[in-house]
Amino acid sequence: MNVLKRGSDQDNWWQAYPGLYARELAAYEGHGASHRPLIQQDGTLILEVLWPMDSAGSIRLNVGYSPLHPFCRPSISAPELQLERHQNPFTRDLCLLTQDSAQWYPHQMVADFIAERLSQVLQVMTLRRNEQWSEAASLEEQAPDPVTPYHMHVAEEYSAVFFDGQQTVPNAPLGTAVFLLQDRLERGRSPPFQAILSKVEPLSGTWMAKPFDLPKRAGPWKNVIGRWIRLEPPFPEAPEEILAAAEKAIERQSALFPAHLKKLGSIADDDLSITAVVFQEELSYGPDNKGNGWFFLVSRRVPGSRRRQVSLVRGYRLSSDMLSRLPVASALKSKKVVLVGCGAIGSFAAVELARSGVGQLTIIDFDLVEPGNTVRWALGRSVWGLPKTTALHDFLYHNYPWTNVGRGHAKVGSAISNVDDVRKLEGNPMRWLRALIEDADIVVDTSASTECQGALAYMCRSIGKRYVLGHATEGAAGGVVARFKPGAPGCYVCLQQHWSGKTLPLPTIDSSGTIVPTGCNAPTFTGGAFDLQEVSMEVVRSTIGLLAPDVYDSGDWQLSILDLTENGRRILPRWKAETIAPHSSCSCGASQG
């Protein structure tokens, strides 16, 4: 057999490291395995290996080496082996490693790796067949092995169906399904869409299950009636073949009820028809942890012909554990935050608070998004010229539907000298602001305005609300995050007095980092988001710590001071933690005496 070899010495690892290649081949021989190359080109080496087994002769393996060998793991398939787990049913790739890449060690020979892991996988399969579950669990990763992921390589790239992880399905073999569908921007060969599986119903009788939906949806959506059918795995690989199996099952189930067959057949003739296949698959590890798995098959009429194009659309399970990667999220879903100032610090803080699962977020700012803001604002070109609160509100509304976002396009504390403008006001601004603060669990001030800070700090202390302020310094050389609890010693005025008297450290500033952009009538400081987000993230951490101290450690400091430079040079971000003691010149400090 002539094996094609192509590429420079540095492009092919076996040529770049000939000694390693020789050791790899010798390792197979050391285990009594024969080998021959199937392909050896463009950085890829695939060996056909006859691996000896103690009692069953040998197993043929195809061993694919990564172009970045030895740093990255190999791919090993067993074309003639059929395992119920730990093997892709289509490619026959063996799952000998978990998803944790740290299990592959560059110094090991692939043959030694096979000798260790293959026997372990086969032992696990024997234990599972004998229902020795605890023994099997001690040898394999305790993770489910669902059917669905093995089919996703043939799924459409840009379409998606979202469904309730606790979706209730009628005790029936088939029925109709209600989808909410929205077209997406044209990409790929098939017009993409996103859909929500709202409800599945039996063909007859009344089904009382509550329809499923997202908390909020934006833009035009339409109702699409589809079908659902129960099938049993295994399934063929091609979507057309799965749909053909579903059609046969529908025909069999509807044989006694011709009207039902006609109804489901008319759905199949729609320009876009969705058939949901329900089946049992592992949802969690263990012998009795199966639940409903879903395939979504889409049949589209090809324009100008009678042909139809069938594809598989990826389904995404939405459930109460969606935020399980962030344990504090469950404690935040009932919390209300008012954030004042949506600039370089506040815009990122707003996004992170919504991302973290805060239940209610009200954002307040008076400014518009300038093109020059792009280098240090959370959103980009598509929102230039919009009010900052509008841009953030719309982004958060679309992307974090479990957070209710309110907005106020206003400058807190601004005075008016025109009588006509006062008459245009919709109520008393003070009453509006006080109502927001009274209803909130915490106020976050990223306005970078000492006037605004003084007013909000006073109102929060008098009303009894927690208050967090955060801002960067000139030239993005440092920053400050301070947090105040109602009734706690040390207040905003105390902080200012300590800074004035130099009894608390000040953050670093770079007075040369101030510019007046062309066309702008106010100075601003230089600095990019990659530095300023240091402050934003501590604002968020401090806010979450005050909102949910039992879940997320809030720390025992009141003041965090950030330095990003020292002696004119960049340093690694350095935070200093301080306590704000009551100051003798402040009324709260005097009361302590």
From Swiss-Prot:
Q: Which CDD domains match?
A: E1_enzyme_family
The record's SUPFAM superfamilies line, in alphabetical order, gives: Activating enzymes of the ubiquitin-like proteins
The protein's GO terms of the molecular function aspect are:
tRNA threonylcarbamoyladenosine dehydratase; ubiquitin-like modifier activating enzyme activity
Record bears the keyword Signal: no
Q: What is this protein called?
A: Uncharacterized protein y4oA
Instruction: Give a single Pfam family match.
Output: ThiF
Identify the InterPro entries for this entry: ThiF/MoeB/HesA, ThiF_NAD_FAD-bd, Ubiquitin-activating_enz
User: What keywords is this UniProt entry annotated with?
Assistant: Plasmid
Name a single GO biological process.
cyclic threonylcarbamoyladenosine biosynthetic process
